[in-house]
Amino acid sequence: MNVRRLPIPTAVVAAAAALGLGALSACSSGGAAAGDTDKFDVVASFYPMAFLAEQIGGEHVHVTSLTQPGQEPHDLELSTQQIVRLQESDAALHLKGLQPSVDEAIAQSEVGTKIDAATLTSLEDHEDEHGHEDGHEDEHGHEHEHEGGKDPHVWLDPVKYAEVAEGVGKAFEKADPDHAADYRKNTEALVGKLHDLDAAFETGLKNRKTDVFITTHSAFGYLAERYGLIEEAISGLSPESEPSGARVKELTRTAEADGVTTVFYETLVSDRTAKTLADDAGLKTDVLDPIEGITDGSRGDDYFQVMESNLKSLQTALGAK
């Protein structure tokens, strides 16, 4: 669509040349040039943002995700080609605090429309297993901190995700007014589906035997808060942080005291820690997907299908009738 096309900074051009990238019209995963289409070109940071852009934009948008399927988004480092792609886009959609390299690239870019999903709903502090705000080292000694200690995983709460969707829809309407009516209609339809999903979780998790569930990664704080559950995470908000031996023993006692049957792991991170804890405590394992990306191993083809699978897994684990 090329709503606003600005010159690419000299530093980016030089870096691209140094890497032998040639022409600067970077191709998206779909094969079309991000800055060279007749549509509203949106670069999204990772799957939950790309899904919103696609659902709201419909036929009027061309969406490129910076995080590829199967790639762990927390540790994403952008290539020069991706930075060029971002620079040539009409809009950038991200969730500040989740991917530092993306936040920095968007802040430094001259993209006409910058949409930070973290400003479209309220973010909260969800403490880690030691009672501290997030800030963990993984097994490689890398520190992972989220913006202001806030938990960014808002898309796992359908109500908060709907709030973000409404904000994205308004931003699209403002940036591409020729298609505002369609963006508004698509946003309303998406928000309606998210409210239906919320109702399904509310109903489906009633009459449960326990409120407690154990996960490898503290991604489900908003979901737990929404439906009155208690998430006990083996690790903190960083999916790669390693738990202490004391934490593993504490979770074993918690599982026995609260009637926990299952240790949940996720699709993009190793299940080794979950299975070790489950074996020690005599528990089962199952998938609870934080939907940071869709892969061939996902239990569904899109956000709604995977969330429905998550609901079924929780119902089984919590003994919901």
Where in this protein do the model-derived segments appear?
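Extracytoplasmic metal-acquisition and chelation regions
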Residues: N2-K321
